[in-house]
Regions:
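Predominantly five- to eight-bladed beta-propeller fold
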Residues: 57-84, 174-220, 255-273, 326-350, ...
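Short beta-strand element of the alpha/beta-hydrolase
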Residues: 524, 531-542
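Non-catalytic accessory segments flanking enzyme active sites
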Residues: 55-64, 173, 217-218, 253, ...
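Asp-box/WD-like beta-propeller blade repeats and closely related beta-sheet repeat scaffolds
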Residues: 102, 127-135, 141-164, 173-210, ...
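Multi-bladed beta-propeller domains
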Residues: 23-39, 75-78, 86-104, 128, ...
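Blade-terminus and WD-like Trp-Asp/Gly-His loop motifs, strongest in beta-propeller folds
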Residues: 43-51, 106-115, 160-170, 241-250, ...
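Active-site-proximal cap/loop segments of hydrolase catalytic domains
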Residues: 59, 88, 98, 549-559, ...
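Beta-strand C-termini and the immediately following turn/loop, strongest in propeller blades
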Residues: 54-59, 116-128, 171-177, 208-213, ...
């Protein structure tokens, strides 16, 4: 009954907001409006959930970047935000800084009375290098105080912040000021020369080493009143650090990498160390060779950690004791056919007919550290750390598509329940659930069509902080109690948008050419009329399911276009087939629905989506206009390019996003098959290709290749270069507006021009 009431209340709130918005006179959503849409990020929440530190960001304030300095450790890209301190009880908002600041991080003291704030200032005088400034905001006095800086060292721009339990000090990372000069000199050497030598005998790629040197930091405890620093750990390449709950020690991940790792993007071999906070004495707990490839989950007191290795869960203490398996692999029968010892914890799965071997992942410890949440394809388990007994609390079906989308948020402080976000697989029904560990009952706290994000539970377990939207408008920040019996809106970030015409969205199901069920997100043209067909633009990437405000879709739908984000089923080895199998099937479905005009189909994508777009139009001529933004077209030339990203462009096809499945020399035919440039002669769709000359990810040479190829072949193509731009090509407010308007103009010219009369009787079947 209570859940039904809560659903009804939330639905009424959504309806009231929608009705109020529809009652206002509306105007078109423009390219200029795209730069005005504010978004919120939560920096930290007090332990009792009463206050939230959040940053509010507008694209308008961050439109210009010096992209030529990508990879320069002494350059900071703009991240200009308004810092807000929000009282979650009253909704009152304080802004400690007048105007915009570049907030690096922020952390509340244990009592919630003070907030440490680290901000960055670029090209600080007199050094000419960016500098960090540390401030403390006192909630009682509503006063902002700058923490005095040291003479020879400064708080590192990549520092974490952590208060000691008594609030007497803030643990920070410090950086020697002389390191900045050396880093900038190395950057200039790599970019300006005049002579640059690269050697395969060097252990590191040059750009990889430059980035790692930025981790050289020391750790100290800073007195927030005087700025006096008490050293804890001398300078080292520190990847990350955390202070224990009682403040007695730090756990430190120290970079011990000996050479560039081609197996992982930004691969780092870390050593796990424990450092006494009082004496600075360090002790190695896990060597780099043992830690490699592991993700550690920590107990609340910081004295135990767990990890999964080859699907088996281990727990280990910081006292140097050996790791202990909590999910031992079933023992194999001996030569005489003896069965494994049934008394062995975890040796049996409960299925006596088939003791299937499960592969587990670790999620989190209970607050007291006595239990672990682990997951497998069979479900969610609670495992007792003491004796490794495990209890299945959320069973899952073998067919993943029949299970809800579940993501753990955290344990209740008393360990009685686990909270998770929940989403249906076949419709927009989403929310938050409470899973009772003892009874295994899953209780919906809130469940409706709204889109929930960034859900976090305060440490005391009494307050949820989250973002929510109706799926068509930008999200705002909300708070609710642990039962979701009351939800309160904390921000109104975009009140002006109530006067704008926005599209409505719909989840559309379809089957690809192989019969696999897929989903995509349709946004209808503003002022859509049922029974009338519209030009439609397909925006490609990988998979889509949830809606949510999309500024570009809002802009295009205001000009009479439907916009569809289709999903595809990507297969390692031959991913290129997925788009023609999936996107054309999605087009067929939208034509069947009476939404899409079959003669006015457009397609576009950015980065991987741009790559997909050009590859798609080499396989079908159904699309009458295409736009490639920062997408590759030549897998061979792309393979070892983009040096500032280290091994990213070799790793992507070998092991990750591009899904080729091996090196260029393992599968040369796959690289050729997925290079649109080699099939440019098959392209009949007019192509607009857009790039930024300073793109460190997908070089502008990729757009250059396809432009000159299509021009040579007599095809219709246009190449737009933003000389100062990068992977996001526009690099100013004016360029951002130009970018969106150029894309619109391309579609206006090719999807809305009068069609020539054709003999429809001669039309053949379409792929």
């Amino acid at each position: 009954m209570h859940t039904a009431i809560r659903r009804a209340v939330m639905a009424l709130v959504v309806l009231a907001v929608a009705s109020a918005a529809s009652a206002q006179p509306s105007s078109p959503f423009t390219a200029e409006d795209m730069l005005k849409v504010a978004s919120v990020s939560v920096l930290d929440v007090t332990e009792d959930g009463s206050r939230v530190a959040a940053s509010v960001r507008l694209p308008f304030d961050n439109a210009t970047v010096d992209n030529r300095r990508y990879g320069d450790p002494t350059y900071l890209s703009p991240s200009n935000v308004t810092l807000q301190i929000i009282d979650a009880r009253t909704g009152a908002i304080d802004t400690p800084f007048k105007g915009l600041v570049s907030v690096r991080t922020a952390a509340w003291s244990r009592d919630g009375k003070r907030l440490a704030i680290l901000i960055a200032q670029d090209a600080a005088v007199p050094s000419g290098f960016p500098s960090a400034k540390l401030f403390v905001w006192e909630t009682g006095r509503k006063a902002l105080t700058e923490v005095p800086a040291g003479a020879d060292t400064a708080v590192a721009l990549n520092s974490s912040l952590a208060w000691t339990p008594d609030g007497a000090a803030i643990l920070v990372a410090l950086r020697d000021r002389t390191q900045d000069a050396a880093a900038r000199a190395k950057f200039r050497e790599l970019t300006e020369g005049p002579i640059v030598v690269h050697k395969s005998t060097d252990p590191f790629l040059e750009w990889d080493l430059l980035g790692r040197d930025n981790r050289s930091r020391s750790i100290a405890a800073l007195d927030p009143r005087t700025g006096a620093a008490r050293p804890i750990l001398p300078q080292a390449r520190i990847s990350s650090y955390e202070v224990s709950r009682d403040g007695a020690f730090l756990r430190v991940m120290e970079d011990a990498t000996e050479k560039t790792d081609y197996e992982t993007i930004g691969g780092t071999d870390n050593v796990l160390k424990f450092v006494d906070a009082a004496t600075g004495q360090a002790r190695t707990v896990m060597a780099a060779k043992d830690l490699k490839g592991l993700t550690l989950r920590w107990s609340d007191d910081g004295r135990w950690f767990a990890y999964a290795k080859k699907g088996e869960v281990f727990v280990q203490g910081i006292d140097g004791s050996a790791p202990r398996s909590l999910t031992p692999k079933p023992a194999k029968a001996d030569a005489k056919g003896a069965e494994p010892d049934a008394a062995t914890p975890g040796a049996r799965t409960g299925d006596e007919k088939k003791p299937a071997e499960e592969s587990f992942s670790v999620r989190s410890f209970s607050r007291d550290g006595s239990r672990l949440l682990v997951t497998s394809r069979k479900g969610w388990y609670v495992v007792k750390v003491a004796d490794a007994t495990r209890d299945l609390i959320v069973p899952l079906q073998e067919d993943e598509e029949k299970n809800p989308r579940l993501t753990a948020v955290g344990w209740s402080p008393d360990g009685a329940a686990i909270y998770a976000t929940w989403g249906a697989r076949d419709k927009w029904e989403r929310g938050v659930v409470r899973i009772d560990v003892a009874s295994k009952a899953m209780t919906p706290l809130v469940r409706d069509a709204r889109l929930y994000g960034g859900v976090r539970l305060s440490r005391d377990g009494g307050t949820f902080i989250f973002t929510a939207s109706d799926g068509d408008r930008p999200a705002d920040l909300y708070t609710a109690d642990a039962r979701f019996s009351s939800a309160k809106k904390l921000t109104d970030l975009n009140p002006w948008i109530a006067g704008k015409s926005l599209p409505r969205s719909e989840l559309v199901a379809y089957r690809d050419a192989d019969g696999k069920r897929l989903y995509g997100v349709l946004r209808y043209p503003v002022n859509y009329e049922k029974g009338r067909t519209y030009p439609i633009i397909f925006e490609l990437y990988e998979t889509f399911f949830d809606n949510g405000f999309n500024a570009r879709a809002a802009f295009l739908t205001n000009h009479g276009y439907a916009v569809f984000h289709p999903s595809v089923n990507l297969v390692v080895g031959q991913p290129g087939e997925a788009w023609v199998k999936g996107v054309t099937s999605a087009a067929n479905r939208l034509i069947e629905m009476g939404v899409a005009d079959p003669d006015k189909l457009g397609v576009q994508g950015t980065s991987y989506g741009g790559y997909a777009t050009v590859l798609l139009i080499t396989q079908t001529d159904r699309f009458k206009a295409a736009v490639n933004v920062s997408g590759k077209v030549d897998m061979v030339s792309f393979y070892t390019d983009s040096p500032r990203l280290g091994v990213r462009n070799t790793h992507a096809p070998e092991k990750s996003q591009d899904r080729i499945g091996g090196t260029l020399w393992d599968y040369p035919e796959r690289y050729l098959d997925h290079s649109a440039i080699l099939r440019a002669d098959r392209i009949k769709t007019p192509l607009l290709t857009i790039s930024g000359d300073q793109d460190p990810n997908v070089p502008a040479s990729q757009s250059r290749e396809i432009y000159y190829a299509l021009r040579r072949l007599g095809k219709e193509v246009e190449w737009v270069r933003y000389v100062n731009g990068a992977h996001r090509p526009p690099d100013s407010v004016a360029e951002s507006i130009d970018f969106e308007q150029r894309i619109l103009a391309w579609y206006e010219a090719h999807l809305k021009k009068p069609e020539k009369k054709t003999d429809t009787s001669a039309l053949g079947a379409r792929r």
